[in-house]
Amino acid sequence: MIEVKNIAKKFGDKTVLKDVNLEIKDGSVFGLVGTNGAGKSTLLRLLTGIYEADEGEIKYDGEPVFDNEKVKEGIVIVPDELYFLPNSNLKRMAKFYESYYKSFRRKRFDALVETFRFDKEKTLSKLSKGMKRQAAMILALSVRPKYLLFDETFDGLDPMVRQAFKQIIIKDVEDNNTTVIFTSHSLRELEGVCDTLAFINNDTVVFSGDIISIQNSMFKIQVAFKEEFDKDTFEGMEILGFEKNGSVANMIVKGDREEIEQKIKAMNPVLFDVVMLNLEEIFNYQVGASGYSFDMSLLEEE
């Protein structure tokens, strides 16, 4: 299990992360979602022990990760900005991985190369972005680590390759109890893969939890009453969005779904309907509620 407690990180005077707390269970597929520049990549580098936290601690099965080679042997990361040895090909990189990771499986590597029809002899620096990412993922998956971390996971991969890698990763989780962490600014990439999510905004985790709980904690309600009403009618409820057209209002509500349904039904509405939100909608409303938005009025013509 990975425990992240009260983590903070600065670069100079700039605060990148503050008061970050997470618990990632073994065998889970954990998605770390946030806008560009939210701190996802920094947190991933803290999780791998590349960076040292200014405050707080990160532990793997009770052991600190920073400056701990024993823990790091069980962690493999595919970063957003890929790095390969100068003038290397996949064949040479496999030897390098094999020399560092005791768990590197040559048979697994050969099978992945054959599956994706990857030319091991081609110089990696001359390949496209998508092919470089394929190479990095083949190497990472050949290690069969206990902890597998991906930054902007499927960026540059075509749809068929992306789906194939997803299937391989999910099978590793099922067969080997691998713990996987994905970061992305696109929830569509992670939906259907992750069982747990954390949303980062304004340098910290806004909320986290298993996907079912998250989807049940925020929803859209369509409601109407005989009498006149406005947002204040629903005092005591956390309303993230309220729009009224005529006598019908559409609201985005955060909280215990069953409890909120009971409260509104007790108000005797003439129309009442609950609509589930997808994860991308939840993320957009949550981030908007915490102050991230664009002032589109600046683009209006004078």
Where are the regions that the model predicts?
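Helix-to-loop junction immediately C-terminal to a conserved catalytic motif
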Residues: 48
